[in-house]
Amino acid sequence: MLKLEKITYLYDHLPMCFDLHIQPGERVAILGPSGAGKSTLLSLIAGFLAPTSGHMLLNNQDHTASPPAQRPVSMLFQENNLFAHLTVEQNIGLGLHPGLKLSGEQRLLLQHIAQQVGLESCLDRLPAQLSGGQRQRAALARCLVRSQPILLLDEPFSALDPALRNEMLQLVDQVCINRQLTLLMVSHNLDDAARIAQRTLLIVEGRIDYDGPTQALVDGSAAKASVLGIKSAVIS
């Protein structure tokens, strides 16, 4: 479970406040204009930013003031942050131990995750030898080996071409189902949101302006669809 109660934060003179309740295993997309607070919301959940006030429960534990390393979350950004001098196997292994001192059990887990994301034949390669999609797969694998119940994605596939982006979304969808992960994914693409999440949050000026079915935004039946440039089917 993920629960935010009046979590506030001041960003460049824009006061933000978030109230949110997400059930275990739920997949939620986060949309909204640039600068509205989408990435800030994820950073608050991950612990990279400290809220001014409020209360946060992650996995039924109070993590309002916990440092990032102690939170039950993994986060993947648009920039994959792979180390160029390390192999794919070593980059993934950093998710298990910063010094890469892995036990036999951890090595087996790494091999299993690499197979899940389709990188079992690339483990001895350097990031420069991978395609853009493979690099994002490696970054995703590094998140998954941590075995945390909450996965945060901050536009990690936006730089990929449509075919690769769709491939990665299908992979994330399958991984979340298999591992029963709770997912929050920031995107600027409503179609991507619809592929992976039945529920969408629309962030506007530091507030959750819409919390409801993704499909209602797609077909314009939600009045707030106009924020995304979609003509609303609602007659006022």
Swiss-Prot record:
Q: What is its EC number?
A: 7.6.2.15
Q: Which UniProt keywords apply?
A: ATP-binding, Cell inner membrane, Cell membrane, Membrane, Nucleotide-binding, Translocase, Transport
Q: Which InterPro entries match?
A: AAA+_ATPase, ABC_SmlMolc_Importer, ABC_transporter-like_ATP-bd, ABC_transporter-like_CS, P-loop_NTPase, Thiamine_ABC_ThiQ
Q: Where is the ABC transporter domain?
A: 2-230
GO terms for cellular component: plasma membrane
Where does the protein principally reside? membrane
Q: Which reaction does it catalyse?
A: thiamine(out) + ATP + H2O = thiamine(in) + ADP + phosphate + H(+)
Q: What does this protein do?
A: Part of the ABC transporter complex ThiBPQ involved in thiamine import. Responsible for energy coupling to the transport system.
- The name on file for this protein is Thiamine import ATP-binding protein ThiQ
The organism encoding this protein is Yersinia pseudotuberculosis serotype I (strain IP32953)
